[in-house]
Amino acid sequence: MTTRLFISVLRIGAACAIGLASLCATADDAIGLRTRYTDLREQLDHNIFQRAIYIDSTQVGENLKGDVYAVLDYPFSRVTSALKSPENWCDILILPFNTKYCRAANGEGGANLQVRIGRKFDQPVQDAYLLQFAFRGVAATPEYFESRLAAKEGPLGTRDYHIAISAVPLDEKRTFMHLSYAYGYGMTGKMAMQIYLATVGADKVGFSVTGKDANGQPIYMGGVRGAVERTAMRYYLAIDAYLDALNAPHAQQLDRRIQTWFNATEQYPRQLREMDKPAYVAMKRNEVERQQTASQ
């Protein structure tokens, strides 16, 4: 047992002993995530992705979930400060190709994010699908952080969207993070996904490896699980790009986020390549400017 994990065990015992149920649960979650890190050390340290990540997915009935576990080369304080803000989440979510707009606001039920999802190319905001995410900060302690986004309805009969982030500090410079992206679908969503997988998504694959071919090359997850892994990976890369850009002067951070996110996706062309860099950069600059103008 590591020293930090041992300290966490002592803290959970103290919290539970004095009846602090919420702290008890939070400490329990922290221990669970640290245990997951220990279990995944081999995969995190030795993989084909050129970074310390582990990606998996599940499908249960009409529900899909993609999971990314990653070691972030940033202090825990930077990660938690960035991910506890709904406004920062909009700066993160706007980076993937098909996000057209994001606006953080406060409603009767708390903070929410109005996100427009559409084509991977330039598109008017009003033509993109609206997802209304409720934002909830679950935990923020020196040993554990968790926040969640949830949307009841999505485009084309999809539903129950969830983006969840949890993190624990590994040392003064590194953080272990778990990102999960999940949604459910009905008949309309199933048909739309089948059309996508038979056309523009036919050659796409995911990131988890299901075996090796006759030449010893990895066989990657395909189908709907491959698709949900790609989306989860895009969001992870967006978080990493946002955290990296904090090293730059404020006026340069937007362009650095855009450049960093695209360059990262190009490391995985079979999974994530959608357009050339000049087209992506121009599109995102326009979308962010449009987003900033609309929020004024």
Task: Please name every model-derived segment.
Residues 51, 64-68, 78, 111, ...:
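Envelope-exposed proteins and targeting segments
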Residues 2-16:
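Bacterial N-terminal signal peptides that target proteins for export
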Residues 28-49, 53-54, 69, 152-154, ...:
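Terminal "cap-and-tail" regions of soluble proteins that handle hydrophobic small molecules
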Residues 73, 106-109, 135-144, 166-176, ...:
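A short, structured loop/turn motif at beta-sheet edges
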Residues 22-26:
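N-terminal signal peptide c-region/cleavage motif recognized by signal peptidases
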Residues 55-82, 104, 220-227:
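Terminal, regulation- and interaction-focused segments at domain boundaries
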Residues 98-162, 184, 242, 265, ...:
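Glycine-rich portal/gate segments that line the openings of hydrophobic small-molecule binding cavities
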Residues 72-98:
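Amphipathic alpha-helical segments
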